[in-house]
Amino acid sequence: MDTYHFLPSRDLEHASSYTPRPDSPETRHEPDPDRSKTNRRPIKIVSSVLLSTLILSFVIFLLVNPNVQQVVRKKVSKNSNGEDRNKASKSPEMLGPPSRGVSQGVSEKSFRQATAEPSYPWTNDMLSWQRTSFHFQPQENWMNDPNGPLFHMGWYHLFYQYNPDSAIWGNITWGHAISRDLINWLHLPFAMQPDQWYDINGVWTGSATVLPDGKIVMLYTGDTDDLVQVQNLAYPANLSDPLLLDWIKYPDNPVMFPPPGIGSTDFRDPTTAWIGRDGKWRITIGSKVNKTGISLMYKTTDFITYELLDNLLHAVPGTGMWECVDFYPVSVTGSNGLDTSVNGPGVKHVLKSSLDDDRHDYYALGTYDPINDKWTPDNPELDVGIGLRLDYGKYYASKTFYDQDKERRLLWGWIGETDSESADLLKGWASVQSIPRTVVFDKKTGTNILQWPVKEVESLRSRSYEIDDVELKPGSLVPLKISSAAQLDIVASFEVDEEAFKGTYEADASYNCTASEGAAGRGILGPFGILVLADDPLSELTPVYFYIAKGVDGNAKTYFCADQSRSSTASDVDKEVYGSDVPVLHGESLSMRLLVDHSIVESFAQGGRTVITSRVYPTRAIYSAARVFLFNNATGVSVTASVKAWQMASATLKPFPFDQL
């Protein structure tokens, strides 16, 4: 068994304003006051401190009372034998444990209802159809953030936030799965459970750091019995085990407490560490001061004792709480990914934050100063939280890691549900992970990254369909003869009639995807694109489309949008229009790629410059009734479209076959 010699048992140096209760168990290791003073560092940006949010005793009661946690669940997904698990209905009950809310550092789920009775009469067939076939998800229950992804001894490892008891948030445990190819997965036993005072209310989000000698360090946030967010250390019990089945929590956890000036519920989600020129490791942790989102900086040599730096890595006023911060380098000249510690000429750094206030992931490109441990955005107008988003749809708490096996940086993201919690309870599961994406610097624009599905997903492609140079006149609709449209990989390009475009002097210069009428709103130069998950009478449809706006100066701006407003006849689902503008360079065709997997549509424009993830819950356009159409709803321009589509096989997701070892 491997031992971690860099993890000696000793007192911790805590820069903390938090002190455990006097009646805490003897197993707790309280900070040494003298040592604590040594590392107390004032944060220069802090002029005033918000008091911690009041934690209601009623919430605590609900969380710990097992009787209350028994919530009606009527599961309709299939078991491993293909049998329907839904045998009988139960009368609606009041929901037990509430969703993780602002008091615990995370916003409520959208469309939360007071009872388990859905407002729409979902059938078993409808709910069963919603389960994806080639996206990662547990066999049942709730999942959220991806955690600590890494590659070890031939296996990709994914850990994730998981509730083993219900399809709603609670009792957060680290699920664990492995894969050879990032597509087909084997479920393993839980990696870590909430069983210590420092994580009894949840083993929250964390990151893995693979050291130069191959050792693995896992830092994660624990929610203590006092509902205080602290950082903890864990490591594999046996590094020679390719499955990494057993994890040891460091005996002297926590290794970091909320520092002075930081609220006890505003300190979470440590990043992967990177090593500086001084030989010390750095990590950053998201937080806030008033309405300013910040990224705290720490140094360590052994991952046990930490020095809080005077300066912040970065801060952006008005962005609120930063969580799930990610920080990594990208090459501006090469096509490979970079290890997190790489810096120097030809390198830019991506800083990404998940904003708790609006539940979106924002990123910016910039320069990292390793001497002063400061990051500066290339364009302050596109700073973190006010500029570019990783994904303009339902996508949150994303996490990258460096795949040393294939020299690429890979991105995971949590795709939550946008139906009601009561519907989630009926189907017995909630949330999936995105298809992993490669991340590279866009050398053509120099202003953004490119995200693209990993090549391994193409192994699921089967029967193909291709159509070239189809003219779409204004107002036209062309069905594509695809027999099964619930699992598709679609690549399409569009050419706008050049003469008509040049003859248009002004067209919807103030267009905005989210404030528009969606694909039904007709303009001179758009919308045009693809309808997926549509039925023949078009009573349900999900358009993904381009829309070109042109100002009086002749400059055009292209938008990429996904319209959910008519995606379902159900009333208790999200029906927003998502999207944003997408850079289109001179000579480029308009291009999109869509991954359709039942209730998920992941859409990529212009090679991944703009990405949108949609959750849709059709009631009619399901199974054999699902169709695909090309459309052009513009009033003043014809479009020529070419499409290639593949039906996608289902990925394998099953328990690891321990009985075959």
UniProtKB/Swiss-Prot annotation:
One of its GO terms (biological process) is carbohydrate metabolic process. Keywords: Disulfide bond, Glycoprotein, Glycosidase, Hydrolase, Membrane, Signal-anchor, Transmembrane, Transmembrane helix, Vacuole, Zymogen. Residues 1-40, 75-117 are annotated as: Disordered. Changing residue 277 to P: In class 2 and class 3. Residues 1-44 are cytoplasmic. GO terms for molecular function: beta-fructofuranosidase activity. SUPFAM superfamilies: Arabinanase/levansucrase/invertase (SSF75005), Concanavalin A-like lectins/glucanases (SSF49899). It catalyses: Hydrolysis of terminal non-reducing beta-D-fructofuranoside residues in beta-D-fructofuranosides. Residues 66-661 are lumenal. The chain crosses the membrane at residues 45-65. CDD domains: GH32_Fruct1-like. N-glycosylated; high-mannose and high-xylose complex glycans. Glycans are attached at residues 171, 238, 290, 512, 633. It is a single-pass type II membrane protein. Disulfide bonds join 513-561. One of its GO terms (cellular component) is membrane. There are at least three isozymes of beta-fructofuranosidase in carrot: one insoluble and two soluble ones. Belongs to the glycosyl hydrolase 32 family. May participate in the regulation of the hexose level in mature tissues and in the utilization of sucrose stored in vacuoles. This is Beta-fructofuranosidase, soluble isoenzyme I. It comes from Daucus carota (Wild carrot).
